[in-house]
């Protein structure tokens, strides 16, 4: 940034000039203010509460008239503006205009700097421009719904899950028998992580890793590396010093080595065309693929675990919907793609989970030039070059104006799968009611179909075997790379065949 640019911004900021244009300009947020849950910027002492950081942008927003209460910006210290929006029209327009063409929005890489340092900068997640376009074309076929939802491949995922589920079921039966209790209190978060990583490594990539090795070695490594990526993004120098003083550098190196070993296992099936490697067509050497494999292993495990954990957590608070899904899956001995996709109650539960508690709670973008965006209802906004954009889908999906009783028949901030029936009855289409659970536009998440397949299998099979009830009356959210239930999905499990 040149001195001239910095000086110009400082003058604008002092004068209170709004750098945005159009008929739905955002309103300004001050850096400091009373009564807010957090400062509106990530700092070493608040970065573990990103949802509260976003909430700070909407402090006193109800005093604004028009679209300024949903589109907010921070402009301080001579730095570029930061636009945070929960306006679904603006979110959709910006995502649709993100890509590699001149004048389109880039993915803002600043929130993922730590991820890039740990996994590589040439990944589909981090790259922009022609590198991103090339990476996207390579993964399109393996991740496609038409490919994953073929019966043979679908059954492969199911068989892996069935073996793991039976192993854990026998362990649970033994524990209940020895204790004499009809239910067992467990945190399901770790078990969900193992199942998701197992299907990803052994089915998708055609590798071979045992349940025990995944649980005891690779899950701890991946979880540690994900936490390290977040810390390394917010305060890299401070974290480096802290590791050296505490001896944490040795721990990091061990987990990094285990993460690399897991990457080796995922790549091992490529030469024989195992798993989905036979759908992957590229002459690139294995070494050139490592960045993407690391991102897929960490990102897909994290996102699908979040998705499944939230679905199970919501159902643990909703016995009525748990019973509805059970009625759909109880007679399914083998899950076929047609049976799975035609289970309306299960699919409503998954859709509502993505709406209320999306794993990816915001999407970062950056304006490469002064850019005009137009919404489907013809509103316009000019976003100045260099603006950091945060598409806040978490708060968008919980906003009463967009998802509340007047629109969907239910309050926006409650889990209500029945709202999707009302949406359909009122003639609203999927395009009208986007929840952005997997993003939108050219940079939507390529793992959408894989996530739906894995999570549908896990949730359906769990309900078929167990009744489960939440231990806590309410379950809060924690957030880092993704969101997840803060209690680790703490439930009381009861075997259905014990009735």
What do the PLM-derived regions correspond to, one by one?
Residues 391-426:
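Conserved cytochrome P450 K-helix/beta-meander segment immediately N-terminal to the heme-binding cysteine loop
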Residues 319-321, 440-444, 448-486:
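Cytochrome P450 heme-binding "Cys pocket" and the immediately downstream C-terminal segment
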Residues 2-121, 130-134, 162-163, 385, ...:
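N-terminal membrane-proximal hinge/A-helix region immediately C-terminal to the signal-anchor transmembrane segment
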Residues 107-113, 151-308:
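Cytochrome P450 heme-thiolate monooxygenase catalytic core
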């Amino acid at each position: 940034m040149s001195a001239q640019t910095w000086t110009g911004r400082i003058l604008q900021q002092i004068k209170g000039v709004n750098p945005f244009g159009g008929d739905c300009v955002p309103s300004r947020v001050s850096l400091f203010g009373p009564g807010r849950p957090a400062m509106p910027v990530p700092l070493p002492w608040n970065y573990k509460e990103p949802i509260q950081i976003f909430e700070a942008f909407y402090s006193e927003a109800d005093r604004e008239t028009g679209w300024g209460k949903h589109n907010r910006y921070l402009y301080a210290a001579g730095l570029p503006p930061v636009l945070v929006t929960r306006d679904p029209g603006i979110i959709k327009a910006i995502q649709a205009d993100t890509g590699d063409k001149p004048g389109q929005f880039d993915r803002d890489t600043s929130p993922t700097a730590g991820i890039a340092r740990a996994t590589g900068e040439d990944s589909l997640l981090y790259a922009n421009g022609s590198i991103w376009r090339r990476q996207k074309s390579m993964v399109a076929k393996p991740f496609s719904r038409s490919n994953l939802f073929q019966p043979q491949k679908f059954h492969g995922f199911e068989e892996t899950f069935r073996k793991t589920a039976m192993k854990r079921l026998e362990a649970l039966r033994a524990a209940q028998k020895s204790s004499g209790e009809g239910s067992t209190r467990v945190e399901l978060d770790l078990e969900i992580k193992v199942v998701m990583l197992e299907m990803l490594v052994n089915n998708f990539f055609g590798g071979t890793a045992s349940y025990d090795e995944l649980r005891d070695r690779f899950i701890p490594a991946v979880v540690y590396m994900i936490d390290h990526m977040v810390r390394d993004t917010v305060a890299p120098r401070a974290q480096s010093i802290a590791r050296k003083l505490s001896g944490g550098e040795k721990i990091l190196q061990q987990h990094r080595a285990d993460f690399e070993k897991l990457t080796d296992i995922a790549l091992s099936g490529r030469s024989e065309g195992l798993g989905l490697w036979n759908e992957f067509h590229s002459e690139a050497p294995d070494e050139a693929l490592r960045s993407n494999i690391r991102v897929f292993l960490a990102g897909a495990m994290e996102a699908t675990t979040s998705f499944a954990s939230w679905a199970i957590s919501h159902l643990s608070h909703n016995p009525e919907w748990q019973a509805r899904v059970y009625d759909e899956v109880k007679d399914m001995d083998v899950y076929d793609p047609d049976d799975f996709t035609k289970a309306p109650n299960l699919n409503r539960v998954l859709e509502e989970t993505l709406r209320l508690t999306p794993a990816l709670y915001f999407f970062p973008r950056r304006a490469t030039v002064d850019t005009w965006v137009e919404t489907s209802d013809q509103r316009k906004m000019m976003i100045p070059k260099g603006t950091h954009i945060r598409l806040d889908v978490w708060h968008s999906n919980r906003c009463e104006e967009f998802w509340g009783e007047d629109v969907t028949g239910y309050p926006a901030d409650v889990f209500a799968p029945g709202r999707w029936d009302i949406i359909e009855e009122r003639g609203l289409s999927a395009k009208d009611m986007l929840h952005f659970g997997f993003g939108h536009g050219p940079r939507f998440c390529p793992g959408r179909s894989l996530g739906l397949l894995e999570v549908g299998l896990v949730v359906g099979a769990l309900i078929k075997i167990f009744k489960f009830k939440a231990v806590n009356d309410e379950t809060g959210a924690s957030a880092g790379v993704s969101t997840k239930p803060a209690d680790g999905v703490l439930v009381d499990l009861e075997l259905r065949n014990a009735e």
